Amino acid sequence: SNEIYYYATGSGNDFLRDIAGASADAPVLINDYIKDLPTVTVQGKTYKFLNGIGYGIDGYCCEVGDRLREQGDSKIDYTGIAIKGLLFHYKPRDAVITVDGINCPYKKVWLAPTMNGRYYGGGMMPTPNQNRLGLNRSLSVMVFFGSSKLKTLAIFLSIFKGEHINHRHNIKVLCGHEI
């Protein structure tokens, strides 16, 4: 059981932001954060994840970002992709979110990330109260649903401060062990 440290490099340090604040000048011991990681199964293959797993417009943004990355070395603006996708390209879907065996149906789901930490996607905070080292080691899913394009855009911008959860008619945060 060696000590494992994380040192921030690059621009997307959502993991570091979650465990040590906005920045860290020194390496951070991460052993506690990488044991018993949650898993996701996609097309029969199981993967562990550190921060979050997306559903909805964030998946669309990753697809567009991957295509742009193949075209050149310019920095990918995921927020810009999300806003353009929301206004012109992405269509919300109806979804059933299952949390610890309880099915919760939602109409017009724009976003539904399952989170181990609080941050992902370049500083978005979909589940501001999520605690990756909480006593029960639960996960959170934030469901953004039922809103028009304009209202979605207005609410979406508040996700970077975690204030979107105040829009209770369109945002639900559910917690559980199996999502």
Q: What does each model-identified segment do?
A:
Residues 16-17, 63-64, 123-126, 153-154:
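Short, glycine/acidic-enriched capping/hinge loops at junctions between secondary-structure elements
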